[in-house]
């Protein structure tokens, strides 16, 4: 282990010299002094991510090289544990970036993700297709060394990650697998960008109060704020869940509900943001990757390490669900349609953009309760208190607010 430490120290010095230590001020590349090592969200800026990924990947590769170049015979500690601990800074940077990308994405973050994706894929291939590294893992795996249960689990997962990542492939298949994986990562990112762009492109802007019939006051107030944020007059409804869901549930304007439903359910199906061809390409790439790795379908590959294990198990489970649930669903649709017909609905069949509206009406008629009445009981603060209180009662966990950690 001393030889690894020396090599890492030397490599770290070289990396610092090469970068002139410009990243010393990057909060993603400096150890947090906050409690529990919490990220410095108050200091992290969008421009910090790309250089952080570049340096973190370089450091992670150096850590991998140190394992490979260790002159000592492969052991669980100097190979499997060392590999598990390698790339910890990269894990931190990626964890922060990708969580924010999912929770609060924008075009700048999407552009960074597009640049980072091939970098991360290349690093993944650097590890999974690294023959000397795999040889060390294989030696430990085949050594029959006695391990504790958690150690044995780590070894098994490490071994499988290499095998499922193409380590046993020949040189030509490795090159094919690497190329396909990079293509897939870029197409998957583009798919997400198209969905985001298509979602942001649609807004239903209403300027006549008559068009708001049926909408509760809290929905109207939110629509005013949405309009202001988009520099529009009147009331604006977009395809975000709170705005879309409320409109579909309360609006009496069936034509506008249909417009909203069509916009939501046909996102990214036409124009520059169309995902139709991307879906075909992604499905084809997944199949080719699975075939290269020796699986009949991508489902066989994806399910192997999951609870279901096989596509057959999934299909059987779905069939078991269908048998009791399909008749019940049809009965509920029939009941909803009959209620709607009795209350002024004139169409011969109920449409997807009618379900939310008439379900809310039926619930109100049957139970004399609406979401608006329940709203005061489900304020965010109340829900947080309830969740923490339940954790305390069930598991004895106590949560205390920290004001010294930026969010």
Give the predicted meaning of each segment.
Residues 24-215:
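N-terminal helix-rich structural modules
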């Amino acid at each position: 282990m001393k030889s690894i430490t020396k090599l890492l120290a030397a490599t770290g010095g070289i990396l610092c010299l090469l970068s002139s230590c410009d990243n010393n001020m990057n909060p993603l590349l400096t150890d947090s002094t906050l409690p529990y090592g919490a990220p410095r969200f108050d200091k992290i800026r969008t421009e910090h991510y790309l250089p952080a990924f570049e340096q973190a990947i370089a450091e992670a590769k150096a850590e991998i090289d140190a394992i490979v170049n260790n002159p000592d015979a492969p052991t669980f500690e100097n190979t499997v544990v060392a590999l598990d601990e390698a790339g910890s800074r990269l894990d931190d940077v990626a964890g922060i970036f990708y969580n924010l990308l999912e929770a609060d994405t924008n075009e700048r973050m999407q552009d960074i993700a597009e640049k980072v994706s091939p970098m991360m894929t290349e690093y993944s291939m650097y590890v999974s297709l690294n023959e000397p590294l795999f040889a060390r893992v294989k030696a430990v795996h085949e050594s029959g060394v006695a391990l504790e249960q958690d150690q044995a689990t780590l070894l098994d997962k490490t071994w499988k990650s290499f095998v499922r990542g193409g380590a046993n492939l020949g040189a030509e298949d490795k090159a094919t697998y690497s190329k396909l994986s990079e293509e897939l990562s870029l197409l998957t990112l583009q798919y997400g960008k198209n969905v985001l762009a298509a979602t942001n492109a649609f807004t239903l802007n209403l300027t006549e109060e008559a068009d708001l019939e049926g909408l509760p006051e809290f929905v109207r107030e939110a629509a005013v704020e949405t309009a202001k944020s988009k520099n529009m007059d009147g009331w604006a409804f977009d395809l975000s869940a709170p705005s879309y869901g409320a409109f579909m549930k309360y609006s009496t304007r069936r034509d506008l509900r249909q417009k909203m439903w069509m916009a939501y359910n046909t996102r990214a199906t036409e124009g520059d943001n169309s995902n139709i061809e991307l879906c075909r390409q992604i499905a084809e790439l997944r199949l080719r990757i699975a075939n290269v790795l020796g699986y009949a379908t991508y489902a066989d590959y994806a399910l192997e390490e999951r609870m279901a294990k096989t596509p057959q198990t999934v299909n059987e489970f779905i069939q078991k669900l269908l048998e009791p649930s399909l008749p019940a669903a049809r009965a509920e649709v029939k009941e909803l349609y009959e209620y709607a017909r009795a209350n002024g609905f004139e169409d011969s069949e109920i449409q997807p953009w009618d379900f939310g509206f008439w379900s809310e009406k039926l619930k109100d008629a049957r139970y004399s309760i609406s979401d608006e009445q329940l709203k005061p009981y489900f304020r965010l603060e109340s829900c947080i208190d309830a969740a923490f209180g339940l954790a305390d009662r069930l598991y004895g966990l106590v949560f205390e607010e920290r004001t010294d950690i930026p969010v």
